[in-house]
Amino acid sequence: MTPQTLNQKLTAAHIPPDLIDKIEQMTAQSKSNPLLVEPTQKYINMMLSLPWDAVTRDTLDLSGARAILDKHHYGMGVIKDRILEYLSVLALKARGQKEGSRAPILFFVGLVGTGKTTLAKAISEAMGRRYARIPFGGMGSALDLRGQSRVHPDAEPGQLIKALIRAGSKNPVVLLDELDRVAESTRADIMGVLVELLDPEQNVRFVDHYLDYPFDLSQVLFIATANNTKNIATAVLDRLEVIQMPSYSDEEKTAIGRDYVFPKQLTATGLSNETLIIASDVWPLIVRPLGFDAGIRTLERTINAVCRKVAREIIEGKSKKVEITKENIKQYLPSEVG
């Protein structure tokens, strides 16, 4: 690639002029040192992949947002109202009424399976923004977030920069998932990076060690989740608005299973509501096969297992249509609960 072609590519990607100068210097140095060719090309490709100027346009329509939330989540009236208030603040900010309109960072806290991650996805869909998730479970180093210096042979950017590349936009919804599950040995360092990420005074010039150049994160919409707040640093909590997720009652889980999970699993397994029917008095047996469960993970797995067994039965020619009743439910429940 000629210097002129490289310059044109970098300029077209809206890379800042001083960074273009730096890249061109690196390229010139690599010509006299073969060992620098591969890492320099890797760096250039990474810079070209970053969404320096790419943004999506928000669709902040509250009635549409409510419909999306209702489509994905049963009940949760208080939480949905809080999310709509949150979106209203963002809408006012977008109109230019910025004074006092900075939206806090939502922090969904609750047991596994209570809908934290899917709420974040629903917010992304409601806003028309792209979505990326950063899992914190078992994260063992602050470098996982901030990246490694290019002096290391296998250096890479941190999870945040990778998330932006995956999203392909500068303003995605980024889910910081399970903040409470980072490795204990590096918790303090990771929390320190989080403070910087979530602080609007600092994240406008976030420096990933691999990039070695400030990147503006001010348009990223961060949402966080955790099972509890016990292991979250106070400085991080101060930047988050905790929203406690409720546990589901059996009646709520019945409605969720019947009206939300079951139709999705029918589609996922190639069935229809004509080939698989579940009698209404069977749902209590499906909802609580293992005793108390605050979330719906067990419910989702159980319904999925039932659908898979029916799909196999139909493919093997044993049935054309299956109706599950109290009399035959046990043969369709997964073995660990049947």
Feature locations, PLM:
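Conserved C-terminal "switch" segment of AAA+ ATPases
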Residues: 12-18, 55, 168, 228-238, ...
